[in-house]
Amino acid sequence: MNARLTGLGLNLLSFAVGIGGWYLLTATGAVVLPGPVDVLERAVTLLLNGQLVGDIFASLRRVLSGFVLGVALAIPVGFLMGWYRIARSPIEPWVQFFRMIPPLAVIPLAIVTLGIDESPKIFVIFLASFLSSVVATYQGVISVDRTLINAARVLGAKDATIFARVIVPASVPFILVGVRIGLGSAWATVVAAELIAAQSGLGYRMQQAQLYYDLPTIFVSLVTIGILGLFMDRLLQAADRRLTQWQERA
């Protein structure tokens, strides 16, 4: 408990120092950017007129849709690649091929083929989340200590039992790392997608604000994305601690 309180205190201190440094830089004119007070005032205005809430829900809907679909497909595909060599050979090269292509580069193609509605945005988010999570899951399966597998076989365990009792638990830390990376990729991708083709969302709001050099609104969107991403990442960290209680931690 004391360690958690200390960590929380250091987190809050870090944020306070960061905001204080931001305030000093803008107040002294060292950088020509809006200060924390200006950004807070604009955030209140956007909250009261409903724009910020609408943009948050629009971006969250896209992120969660693509992210959940990507992870839901990545985990079984990753296990399939890692557990069955006959499946690994035809699938793994394609995964690595598409992993080398930035999801943002797919946005124009997705818009041309899927239209300008929600489909292309969700697709590129799905792709970014899938590629991050599938590689982590695959790596987790092939990294399982062979001694554990051989010991289970000596004790008479069948393949299904080994998979459920050895492979899956040992792979969970890798999977959760991939999921967290996929979450970051999902947020980066949704902002880029909204910058190009959207009528709502935090990325769309930044693009509109850029046209009028509205820096406070741009900062509101940036800070909101950071807060939402941090909150979702903390939820995944909590799930990680609960699912991997057996694992020794530094």
UniProtKB/Swiss-Prot annotation:
Protein name: Probable ABC transporter permease protein BRA1188/BS1330_II1179
GO biological process, one term: transmembrane transport
Role summary: Probably part of an ABC transporter complex. Probably responsible for the translocation of the substrate across the membrane.
Family annotation (CDD domains): TM_PBP2 (cd06261)
Family per similarity comment: Belongs to the binding-protein-dependent transport system permease family.
Domain (ABC transmembrane type-1) ranges: 56-236
Source organism, top-level taxon: Bacteria
Gene3D superfamilies found in the cross-reference section: MetI-like
Pfam families xrefs: BPD_transp_1
Main location: membrane
Species assigned in the record: Brucella suis biovar 1 (strain 1330)
